[in-house]
Amino acid sequence: MTLGKFLADATCNSTDKNVTFFPSYGAEQRGGTANCFVVISDEAIGAPLGDVMDDLIVMNGPSLAKFLPTLKQGGNLFINSSIVSDDIGRSDVKLVKAPVTELALEMGNAKVLNVIMLGVYVGYTEVIDPAIVWETIEHKLASKPKLLPLNKQAFEKGLELGRGQR
């Protein structure tokens, strides 16, 4: 959810693109599988949810099973390869693997896995200038300045991973 919110806020506040953010909460709200949809478009957005997605970011196995069928042919699938198998049963999508859980633990804080994956996504897709995304993260974490260096390192690591898989 954090990853989607950062992406939507950065795009909405700093570009001329149209953006929707649609979170889905349920029993999963505290630590389980939750999801959100972010739509970024140069055109007006008629509905916040579509039937087919261009890009899909998957952080766990249950999310892969639930949402992989909605990824369009030729779409980009970003997986947390620390815990999600790359045996996805589809050869018609571009697979971008990032061991974000492992990297976050190596950095000393599992919570930065979302920021690493955000960096992977932005680095791979170039959907938005990374500097704009980082400004949004800085703003969101302004009340917790001690978290900024670790999150900066996490975001930059993700950018490097994403760019390296283009």
Please identify what each model-predicted range represents.
Residues 1-166:
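Active-site cofactor/cluster-binding pocket
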